[in-house]
């Protein structure tokens, strides 16, 4: 006998549930838009303050080209996250590119504008801004359209019919914005002073590796301090997360660790070097030494540990860092210990 999917009581309540859902969705959308509008206005005002103070002769004489870097450090120390050098630079550019705030669309997020600010041509930037508003493009979709040279293709097309065809093709794969997309934007978490939602580790095995490596380095007694897991790195308006970050107080250097449950690949090496460049430019204090990276890879056949030095020379690493860092054999031993426990549980 076939069961009915809904009870009579549920059917009676369905209109009320639908109306309440509509009210809640509308309210969430309004809240998201209000937060976004306030964020944009605040960052625009901060940009105006930066430009105004840059014109101060004493500040220009004291810091010169390093003004933004010094300001970024001062703001981060005083106010917390949200004031990386790149974000402070974008606030400045936001004000310079949109000197009249009323021309800024509240329908686009700060992440949208960070992407738009990378477009130097004013007409081209205006085109993508309007299309993003009219078509409801997400940041990811807008980036895809920019990379596909939609603006240039439209310029080359002849006649309105061809332009409509190009636009229609461009709309394929559109990922429209939702209120929760705005609220979950890392920039919004920073603006509101809320703890950021971090991605979960890919597997229980990676979580076990994190615990093992953290305990090992802290017990090593060579100046390691644990900063955290899944630490965000924002490069070209794209967000990435470093698996583990330590700071060595003896070396005055950050140590970034990436865990991979696959063989070591060139892509993994390139990714951690990108993280190292970010930390050197955005996180390091003037007295800090260059950061270093460690990649730990494990698959069915082997375990590997590799150091990533970024811009650091092998000679400096050998003379200054090696004494305080674990060697590859020690790191591999820690991974193998976790794998041994892991496989013994699987066999039970």
Region spans (language model):
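Basic, low-complexity intrinsically disordered segments
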Residues: 1-348
């Amino acid at each position: 006998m076939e069961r009915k999917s809904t009870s009579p009581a549920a059917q009676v309540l369905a209109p009320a549930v639908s109306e309440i859902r509509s009210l809640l969705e509308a309210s969430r959308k309004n809240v998201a838009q209000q937060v976004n509008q306030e964020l944009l206005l605040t960052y625009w005002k901060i940009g105006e303050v930066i430009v105004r103070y840059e014109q101060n002769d004493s500040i220009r004489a004291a810091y010169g080209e390093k003004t933004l870097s010094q300001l970024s450090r001062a703001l981060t120390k005083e106010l917390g996250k949200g004031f990386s050098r790149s974000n402070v630079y974008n606030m400045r550019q936001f004000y310079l590119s949109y000197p009249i705030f009323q021309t800024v669309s509240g329908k686009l997020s700060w992440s949208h504008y960070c992407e738009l600010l990378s477009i130097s041509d004013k007409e081209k930037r205006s085109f993508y801004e309007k299309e993003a508003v009219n078509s409801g493009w997400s940041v990811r979709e807008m980036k895809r359209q920019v990379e596909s040279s939609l603006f240039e293709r439209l310029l080359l097309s002849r006649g309105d019919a061809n332009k409509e065809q190009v636009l229609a093709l461009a709309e394929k794969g559109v990922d429209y914005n939702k209120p929760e997309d705005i609220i979950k934007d890392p920039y919004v978490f920073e603006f509101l002073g809320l703890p950021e939602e971090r991605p979960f580790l890919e597997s229980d095995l990676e979580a076990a590796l994190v615990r093992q490596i953290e305990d090992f380095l802290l017990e090593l007694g060579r100046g390691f301090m644990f900063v955290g897991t899944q630490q965000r790195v924002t490069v070209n308006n794209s967000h990435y997360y470093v698996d583990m970050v330590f700071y060595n107080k003896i070396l005055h250097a950050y140590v970034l660790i990436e865990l991979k449950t696959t063989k070591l690949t060139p892509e993994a090496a390139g990714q951690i070097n990108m993280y190292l460049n970010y930390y050197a430019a955005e996180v390091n204090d003037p007295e800090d030494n260059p950061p270093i990276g460690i990649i730990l890879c494990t698959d069915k056949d082997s375990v590997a540990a590799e150091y990533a030095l970024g811009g650091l020379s092998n000679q400096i690493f050998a003379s200054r860092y090696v004494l305080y860092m674990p060697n590859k054999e020690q790191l591999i031993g820690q991974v193998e210990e976790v794998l041994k426990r892991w496989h013994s549980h699987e066999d039970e």
